[in-house]
From Swiss-Prot:
InterPro entries: ELM2_dom (IPR000949), Homeodomain-like_sf (IPR009057), SANT/Myb (IPR001005), SANT_dom (IPR017884), Trans_reg/Corepressor (IPR051066), Znf_C2H2_sf (IPR036236), Znf_C2H2_type (IPR013087). It comes from Mus musculus. This is Zinc finger protein 541. Gene3D superfamilies: Classic Zinc Finger, Homeodomain-like. It is found in: Nucleus.
Length: 1363
């Protein structure tokens, strides 16, 4: 490329350049990167360019302005063949790429139609050619969120995310979208076919579009698969690109990523295609299996051969090239301590000609990459250029950068990956090394690592052992490799500089190693020169491991699950054995020299024989930076993976138990602890991809005093301890304990398939237990102080529902606190080795992370948590504190969390989610009064077993009943919630009891579930008193709440243990009646009967039939409408007869004239007779209206009528219901109906097959046709009970045996039993339909004239109870 100069803050000298790629360069990468193993290209290349601009003094070719921001949603890293020697890569993959896609079951991707036309259809914001970034057209930032864009079109598209307008509406389902391409993708869901099928075992889901399948993999299986370009997102709209791809077949849907100028040798743009080649070549190496075994893996069939040129001098992007020791670069530089620095050092890929390898140099271990993965992913501070970073020469030079005369630290934070020619076809191979400048001591430099000069310029000089010149070693001047302030970064390379390398040649077929299962990972790359040793595995973390911040972004950590199905990980012993027995390139053991300098020498395992990646020493980020937040990850998290190395007493890694990638020049004290590549600490992949960042520095006791840490965290705070907590970050540490606390770059953490968005987050987090339960889906959020807070990515909830959701951390397991704390000798125990996988309790599916399990449980419950409000408001709105097991510990949360992983105390600290959410000023024992427990805050159905762990195990949610209205109770102990809603008295309460309070709670009474539905309408079932637990609350908590107002509450709990009331027999004086002692039976004769005699037969009623007939007639009159009160007072008539001493005349006079007159001393003086109320027509109409409006809520009916009590309304309803049920046929047309049925019976007589003399026996009469039960009222009214017709039951089978089948309801006779059965359906239908049809009109409110007339007609018979 043409040399470009930087501004005064730049990191590259003016003479630095990258040579143009020769015409003979051909990149032959064997396999398409068909798995989204890491951050997208934009995450790697375009982390932030706010401080860059083009040098106006240099001529540049046309450069699309939106390359840095455009169309990165579906950007994947592909590799492919390029028949044109000028272009590095073409977008359309070769047949091998398609084969690899088909191996995943995804099928060949279709080529976008617009790709051939050079067009692009991603919405109205991209039309025609793009503008060009220039000093006159600077980068634009969003005024709402501060996001930076390179063109106005990208910014206008971004503004759509802040707008609620959705102009594009689906014609099928009317769903609206903000962009046309979103609508186009949505239309795929309406097609009938579902060609995209999930290939996971036991899963047969199919989807109509690729994005849905990818989302299914991410959410359900926790695996990220290949991102397919949506059909609406095509190649760039530059027609000049057509001729470049005209000669190439478009076999798949891999769209062209940029116009030709982005691919040309003289392009000033960072070439993504080269990065794809790099990434593809590295990813598709074989992960060696442990042990000395050299045979191919059983999964070798999955790999595709690398089509490397057969010539010896050719080189490939794959690590099948001769590696060059990093020690050769600057081996003459004096070695010194590399202190961390405030500036964010960057990793740059620096190519090293493989010719250097021919002179014999030791291969560098690639473990240094391991700790750098978060740096490639961390968001830059305001997306600026990093301090002390080196600008790749192949990048466009943006504003604000000029070439400095000397190496000076820049004022930005930026991550960059140097673009290099992938396969220059010269003799030898290229080695890509990640150079990371040393860090300058940050504010906590005394804790970060060793101290030393931080401004010493670094230069890469050829090793004396090399026969090549510096120009031969590097395709660009060595000044490009140094960053301002890089304090002798070559010390990392000094180790093993005298070792020799056997020349390695590319095999003709350039065989690439297949992926192996995690149990087969080993170090047999020596036997396979093209293989990727375990030392190279940090590259996966650096390039392909996204942070676990977003909800379902754990799929990158589980990518090997999709490749190699194995769920197990190899142990420390396997790694140690493999590292000890790993042969060199020529079959002999090659050992790197111990690190030189002030650190104790360590025996280093042999270095890899593949392309090496060198990472400079770490640095301590500013406190506000996301990397600093990741520093708060406890070192214990790294130890959760069994493959992780143990630390010796000095804090250095034990060589016997550490993979070879854990040692070597990269293990320097200045290593940044924030470079933890494990998110959530319990990932099985941590053993396959060892985390060098979590290893202790080899300074040990010889470290400078400045590296020793506060709070007994010397081991954890060392530069290599990726999970160690910073002392001043103590309050946040337990919250994020064991997890990656912040995303790398905000775009690196985006949820696949969703648009990139950011949300500012407040990190002072306090929430109620229910909020914690609802937020347990999300992952650990950033936990730094709010002033230093950075933007983070939205979780899936934000993208689904929109809004801000604040990720609450997962609880720290108690056993992890005990077993995972650092012992005084620095050797943590493997407290999570047996719990490295998480199993869904519903479907038994295994997950590597808690986040994978929690997101999977979302789909079992079909419920997503709603977005949360600001967390400061939650802190103000609720009292949340922690109740710890050791009450004597009164220190502040800051010091307590500093000591969180210090094993000064042998007992496990009872730190639960509340203690992680508590503000920094909370003390040891502060009971929490959760007054909202009775309002159903714990109704999410989550069960957490504190004996096993405190982690969240989401269970399937049960449908919860609605809060029921009940009148407020007179008790003032518990105030009702909004709207007077109380927990049902028929619901057994649920306590969340702390360990200290378990013995204080009395056993709650168990109430069986009600027979009626708790959610039915009406207030009759629930009594208007509070649950008994509200009264018992202050009494129970008073021994604990000495200084807390007991009027708070209902129950004092900690979100620790959920105790539900199991069914049991309630025992006690509250539930059982007191039974008096048994007395002698003789005493019963003396006792007087206290009951009052209200009726007994008088005179000769029992013997004289005439007297009995007169009494029956009195009862019939009393039940008629003649009596005031309405026809149901048989009880009153008998009482009056008793008072009249058996005289029927006196009893009748009492009923008709003056009514029952009883003295106050009479036992029936206040007795209320059923049906004795008189309802006026107005009251009847009001009752009908109220009943139609409120159904059986008689309290509201009473409110509407106002003249009748609730009891009277209930009585009126049930009397009416009884009369409607039995007298529904008593209509004015009753006689007509009787005659009609009689005619039907007579007509059916002709069909009777019995003899004529038997026929009259079964001929029904009008009296028999009327059912005694149904028409009891009419028989009572028109005849005396003694004269009522009596039906004599016929012997069963007497008629059926003779071939006649009469109906038992209406006495119709049928000659076939089937006819009678069909006829019986008529009676069933009438029984259910007639009451509603007759008595309840459709429009009940207006009282029609017909109803009034009917009421008058029925008044004589039914009294006021009829309508």
């Amino acid at each position: 490329m043409e040399p470009y100069s930087l501004g005064e803050e730049g990191a590259l000298p003016s003479e630095g350049h990258l040579p143009s790629f020769s015409e003979s360069q051909v990149l032959n990468c064997s396999d398409t990167l068909n798995r989204d193993l890491g951050p997208s290209t934009r995450d790697l290349l375009y982390a932030g360019l706010s401080g860059l601009d083009l040098d106006p003094s240099l001529s540049t070719s046309d450069m699309p302005s939106e390359v840095l921001e455009d169309n990165l949603d579906t950007l994947s890293l592909y590799s492919g063949k390029d028949s044109d020697s000028v272009k590095l890569l073409e977008e359309y993959a070769d047949s091998e790429s398609q084969t690899s896609l088909q191996d995943l079951g995804l099928g060949a991707l279709k080529v976008p139609k617009e790709a051939d036309e050079g067009g692009r259809a991603t919405g109205s914001t991209r039309k025609g050619k793009r503008q060009h970034s220039s000093p006159q057209n600077p980068l634009l930032d969003c005024s709402l969120c501060g996001k930076v864009f390179s063109s106005a079109s990208s910014l206008s598209k971004h503004y759509l995310t802040h707008s609620q307008e959705r102009k594009h509406v689906c014609k099928v389902c009317s769903k609206a979208f903000k962009r046309q391409d979103h609508l186009t993708g949505h239309m795929l869901t309406h097609q009938k076919t579902k060609p995209f099928v999930c290939i996971e075992q036991g899963c047969s889901k199919s989807y109509c579009d690729y994005r849905s399948l990818r989302r299914h993999y991410e959410v359900q299986h926790g695996v990220c698969i290949l991102k397919e370009t949506p059909p609406e997102e095509e190649a760039y709209g530059d027609p000049t690109h057509n001729h470049d791809v005209a000669n190439q077949p478009p076999p798949s849907g891999l769209r062209s990523l940029g116009p030709p100028e982005a691919r040309s040798p003289g392009s000033v743009l960072p070439n993504r295609d080269l990065l794809r080649c790099i990434v593809s070549s590295i990813v598709h190496q074989k992960i060696p299996s442990p042990g000395p075994a050299v045979g191919p893996s059983d999964t070798e069939a999955r790999s595709s051969a690398c089509a490397c040129p057969t010539s010896l001098g050719s080189s490939s992007c794959t690590p099948a090239s001769t590696p060059v020791a990093l020690g050769t670069l600057g081996s003459e530089i004096p070695e010194e301590t590399h202190p961390p620095r405030k500036e964010a050092a960057t990793e740059v890929f620096t190519p090293v000609q493989s010719r250097a390898a021919e002179n014999g140099v030791p291969d560098p271990p690639e473990s240094e990459l391991e700790s750098e993965s978060p740096r490639l992913q961390r968001p830059s501070s305001l997306e600026g250029w990093p301090e002390g970073s080196s600008l790749p020469a192949c990048l466009p030079l943006f504003r604000g950068h000029s070439v400095p005369s000397g190496s000076q630290p820049s004022s930005h934070n930026f991550q960059w990956l140097r673009n290099l020619p992938g396969c220059p076809k010269n003799k030898g191979s290229n080695v890509f090394m990640v150079h990371k400048p040393p860090a300058v001591a940050s504010r906590e430099g005394s804790e970060g690592g060793g101290s030393g000069p931080s401004s010493t310029p670094t230069s890469v000089e050829p090793s004396p052992s090399l026969g090549t010149t510096q120009e031969e070693l590097l395709p660009f001047p060595p000044a490009l490799l140094k960053a301002p302030g890089e304090a002798s970064s070559e010390v990392r390379q000094a180790a093993g500089e005298d070792e020799t390398w056997a020349p390695k040649k590319c095999k003709p077929d350039c065989e690439s190693f297949p992926w192996q299962s995690p149990t087969e990972l080993g170090l047999q790359d020596a036997q396979n020169p093209g293989g990727l040793p375990s030392d190279a595995t940090p590259l996966f973390r650096q390039l392909f491991m996204k942070s676990q911040e977003s909800l379902v972004s754990h799929e990158q950590m589980q990518v090997l699950q999709m490749i190699a199905k194995s769920q197990r990980i190899f142990s420390h012993t396997q790694v140690a054995t493999a590292s000890a027995q790993r042969p060199g390139p020529e079959g002999k053991q090659s050992t790197l020299k111990p690190l030189q300098g002030p650190w104790p020498p360590q025996t280093l395992p042999p270095a890899p024989t593949v392309d090496s990646f060198q990472i400079g020493p770490g640095h301590s980020e500013p406190e506000g930076s996301p990397v600093r937040r990741r520093k708060t990850m406890p070192a214990v998290s790294r130890e959760t993976s069994p493959g992780g190395p143990r630390r010796d007493t000095k804090g250095g890694p034990k060589v016997a138990s550490a993979p070879p990638s854990l040692t070597g020049p990269g293990l320097l004290p200045s290593r940044n602890p924030d470079s933890s590549s494990l998110a959530k600490g319990t990932l099985d992949l941590g053993d396959i991809i060892p985390n060098a960042g979590s290893r202790q520095s080899q300074l040990g006791g010889d470290e400078p005093a400045g590296t020793q840490l506060v709070g007994k965290q010397g081991q954890g705070e060392n530069g290599l301890a990726s999970g160690a907590m910073r002392g001043e970050k103590g309050p946040a540490c337990p919250r994020g304990g064991g997890y990656r606390l912040f995303s790398g770059h905000p775009r690196a953490q985006r949820f696949s398939g969703f648009r990139k968005e950011k949300v500012k987050m407040d990190v002072c987090c306090a929430a109620s237990p229910s909020q914690v339960a609802m937020a347990s889906f999300s992952s650990a959020g950033p936990l730094a102080d709010p002033p230093r807070d950075m933007k983070s990515k939205l979780t899936i909830f934000n993208r689904i529902q929109g809004g801000n959701i604040y990720r609450l951390p997962h609880p720290v397991k108690e056993e992890s606190l005990a077993g995972g704390c650092h012992q005084p000798n620095g050797g943590p125990t493997d407290w999570m080795e047996s719990k490295s996988t998480f199993v869904c309790k519903n479907c038994s599916q295994m997950f590597y992370t808690e986040k994978g399990l929690s997101s999977h449980m979302c789909f079992h419950s079909d419920q997503w948590p709603s977005p949360r409000g600001k967390q400061e408001q939650q802190v103000k709105g609720q009292m949340v504190a922690s109740v710890k097991r050791k009450a004597g510990r009164e220190e502040g949360a800051v010091e307590d969390m500093k000591r969180h992983y210090d094993c000064s105390s042998s007992e496990p600290q009872d730190v639960t989610i509340l203690s992680m959410l508590v503000s920094s000023g909370s003390c040891g024992v502060t009971p929490v009064v959760l007054s909202s427990l009775l309002q159903g805050q714990e109704k999410d159905g989550e069960e957490r077993d504190s004996k096993e762990s405190c982690q969240y195990r989401k269970r399937k949610k049960r449908p919860q009943p609605k809060a029921l209205f009940a009148p407020p109770a007179p008790s003032a102990l518990g105030e009702p919630g909004p709207g007077g809603c109380h927990q049902s008295c028929l619901h057994s309460p649920v306590f969340l009891v702390d360990h200290l309070l378990k013995g204080l709670f009395q056993c709650s009474p168990y109430t069986p579930p009600p027979m009626l539905s708790p959610i039915r309408e009406g207030s009759g079932l629930y009594f208007n008193t509070l649950c008994s637990t509200s009264r018992a609350g202050p009494h129970l908590i008073s021994p604990v709440l000495d200084q807390v107002d007991s009027s708070f509450g209902i129950c004092v709990v900690k979100d620790d243990t959920k105790i539900s009331i199991e069914p049991h027999i309630n025992v006690g004086s509250r539930f059982q009646a007191e039974i008096p002692e048994l007395q002698e039976r003789l005493l019963a004769r003396v006792d007087e009967n206290v009951a009052s005699l209200v009726w007994k037969p008088w005179g000769d009623v029992m013997t004289n039939p005439e007297t009995q007939d007169r009494v029956m007639e009195l009862c019939n009159v009393a039940c008629s409408s003649v009596m005031p009160g309405g026809g149901t007072n048989l009880e009153l008539a008998l009482h009056c007869l008793h008072d009249a001493q058996g005289s029927v005349q006196v009893a009748l006079e009492t009923l008709l004239l003056r009514g029952p007159q009883k003295p106050r001393t009479h036992p029936l003086a206040d007795y209320r007779y059923t049906g004795s109320d008189i309802w006026t027509p107005m009251e009847k109409r009001l009752f009908k209206k109220a009943f139609c409006a409120h159904k059986k809520d008689f309290y509201l009916i009473h409110k509407m009528i106002q003249t009748k009590s609730v009891a009277q309304c209930v009585e009126y309803y049930y009397i009416w219901k009884k009369m409607v049920k039995f007298d529904c046929g008593r209509a004015p047309g009753l006689e007509k109906r009787g005659r009609r049925e009689l005619d039907e019976v007579e007509r059916t007589e002709d069909k009777v097959t019995c003899s004529p003399r038997e026929r009259p026996t079964h001929r029904p009469t009008p009296e028999l046709k009327i059912k005694t039960k149904s028409y009891r009222r009419e028989s009572i009214l028109h005849s005396s009970p003694s004269a009522a017709p009596k039906r004599t039951p016929e012997p069963p089978g007497s008629v059926e045996s003779q071939g006649v089948f009469p109906c038992r309801e209406c006495e119709r006779v049928f000659d076939k039993i089937k006819s009678r059965n069909a006829h019986m359906k008529r009676h069933r239908l009438q029984e259910h339909v007639e009451p509603v049809r007759v008595k309840w009109p459709v429009k009940p409110y207006p009282l029609k004239e017909e109803e009034e007339e009917e009421e008058e007609e029925l008044g004589a018979d039914m009294g006021p109870l009829q309508w």
